[in-house]
């Protein structure tokens, strides 16, 4: 099993190319089930979750071809992937596939919309709290679907003639459920109005792609989205937006290690809140012609309190990385997690490196220390795993991160990108 070895102490200087967003690519790929034409996606990252979803879509009858190019040694792959689903050959998404990745559950929306039925296993993915599927079920029921849970599967069927547009208010904001409702409502009869919809850039990206396919959608990026159903969707060509979580992660890595790095192919508007928070911590961030420049030279890291919130608030997917940064701040900071109820699993691993963190419910208190010391640590989920890498960049000696398959789910060749900027990071196999 692979591990990541980090030898701390080096600053980061250079250019890091930002990949396409995993959290945008997955729903875009699933949208290929909505049309019998070809959907072409550019800037698709090469990640374990993407490859798993390719297998799942193939199970449903999607023909997939990949074109990749590598412009120079070490540069991230820029992949163009073509998805063609002439006929859906199977409306069942089996446990052995869906259990490995939560987002694969989202196929339930397009399958219902196009075929009128779906049998989908309850999902897997990161072990972050309960993450129930109630919001998905209730949203699709509002469109007329009949839903039944049986033996770990959801059996869903649309009314005769297809799903029916409706006005629905989510009881809480959910990115995944908003994705599913967008896709399902695009082929529903009549008009659907979604209130309390997620406003994340990935939702907007999906809406833009669906519109290019012929959907009629207004309001994406606001809390109210209106979808006028159409009888069919066509193919389209769409570029996956830059990964804002990867952008924020590398910005925090530079903040931790110090240095001067250009994050290429991204933009500040995707994560204004997180970047403003880093500025408060003492990091200089500016726009460039190709992306963002992140600089921290000499000045110490200032403590900053954060509360995770849906977009445009501070992203929960950057909480662990920011906690790692705060372990070296010149004071005490507090992090309140409001999105997931069990997203502090990285705390005990950061403590193994010398971090001083105490928990009280959904709040963490971080007392900055002057030094961290390398140790063997274990990744518990995707974002927690990269927080350990960030901490390892400044820890004295060697930090060995195990269970890095979590990293491979969401970060495209992380060790290579960091190494190109001067970090001592390598993947080792037992």
Swiss-Prot record:
InterPro entries: Enolpyruvate_Tfrase_dom (IPR001986), Enolpyruvate_Tfrase_sf (IPR036968), MurA_subfamily (IPR050068), RNA3'P_cycl/enolpyr_Trfase_a/b (IPR013792), UDP_GlcNAc_COvinyl_MurA (IPR005750)
Pfam families in the record: EPSP_synthase
Annotated metabolic or biological route of this protein: Cell wall biogenesis; peptidoglycan biosynthesis
Residues annotated as the enzyme's active site: 126 (proton donor)
Keywords linked to the UniProt accession: Cell cycle, Cell division, Cell shape, Cell wall biogenesis/degradation, Cytoplasm, Peptidoglycan synthesis, Pyruvate, Transferase
Name of the protein in question: UDP-N-acetylglucosamine 1-carboxyvinyltransferase
Primary subcellular site in the record, as a coarse category: cytoplasm
UniProt gene name: murA
Organism encoding this protein: Agrobacterium fabrum (strain C58 / ATCC 33970)
Cited SUPFAM superfamilies: EPT/RTPC-like
Similarity annotation: Belongs to the EPSP synthase family. MurA subfamily.
Modified residues (2-(S-cysteinyl)pyruvic acid O-phosphothioketal): 126
Catalytic activity: phosphoenolpyruvate + UDP-N-acetyl-alpha-D-glucosamine = UDP-N-acetyl-3-O-(1-carboxyvinyl)-alpha-D-glucosamine + phosphate
């Amino acid at each position: 099993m692979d591990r990541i070895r980090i030898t701390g102490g080096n600053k980061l200087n250079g250019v890091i190319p930002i990949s396409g967003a995993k959290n945008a690519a997955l729903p875009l790929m699933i949208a290929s089930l909505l049309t019998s034409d070809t959907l072409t996606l550019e800037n698709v990252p090469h990640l374990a979750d993407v490859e798993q979803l390719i297998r799942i879509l193939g199970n449903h009858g999607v023909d997939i071809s990949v074109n990749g190019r590598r412009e120079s040694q070490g540069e991230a792959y820029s992949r163009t992937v073509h998805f063609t689903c002439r006929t859906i050959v199977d409306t069942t998404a089996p446990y052995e596939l869906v259990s490995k990745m939560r987002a694969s559950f989202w196929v339930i929306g397009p399958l219902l919309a196009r075929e009128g039925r779906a049998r989908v296993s309850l999902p897997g993915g990161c072990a972050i709290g309960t993450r129930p599927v109630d919001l998905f079920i209730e949203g699709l029921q509002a469109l007329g679907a009949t839903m039944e849970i049986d033996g770990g599967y959801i059996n869903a069927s649309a009314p005769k003639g297809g799903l029916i547009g409706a006005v629905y208010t989510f009881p809480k904001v959910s990115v995944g459920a908003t994705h599913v409702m967008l896709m399902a409502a695009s082929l529903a009869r009549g008009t659907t109005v979604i209130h309390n919809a997620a406003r994340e850039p990935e939702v907007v990206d999906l809406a833009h792609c669906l519109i290019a396919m012929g959907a009629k959608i207004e309001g994406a990026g606001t809390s109210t989205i209106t979808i006028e159903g159409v009888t069919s969707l066509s193919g389209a060509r769409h570029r996956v937006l830059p990964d804002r979580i990867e952008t924020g992660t590398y910005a925090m890595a530079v903040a931790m290690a110090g240095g001067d790095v250009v994050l290429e192919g991204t933009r500040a508007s995707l994560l204004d809140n997180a970047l403003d928070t880093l500025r408060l911590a003492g990091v200089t961030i500016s726009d460039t012609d190709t992306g963002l420049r992140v600089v921290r030279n000499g000045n110490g890291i200032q403590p900053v309190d954060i509360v995770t919130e849906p977009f445009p608030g501070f992203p929960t997917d950057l909480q662990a990385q920011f906690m790692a940064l705060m372990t070296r701040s010149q004071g005490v900071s507090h992090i309140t997690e409001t999105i997931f109820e069990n997203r502090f699993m990285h705390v005990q691993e950061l403590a193994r490196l010398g971090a001083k963190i105490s928990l009280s419910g959904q709040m963490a208190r971080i007392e900055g220390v002057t030094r961290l010391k390398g140790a063997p640590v274990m990744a518990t989920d995707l974002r927690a795993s990269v927080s350990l890498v960030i901490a390892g960049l400044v820890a004295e000696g060697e930090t060995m991160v195990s269970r890095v398959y979590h990293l491979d789910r969401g970060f495209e060749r992380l060790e290579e990108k960091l190494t190109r900027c001067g970090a001592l990071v390598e993947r080792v196999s037992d």
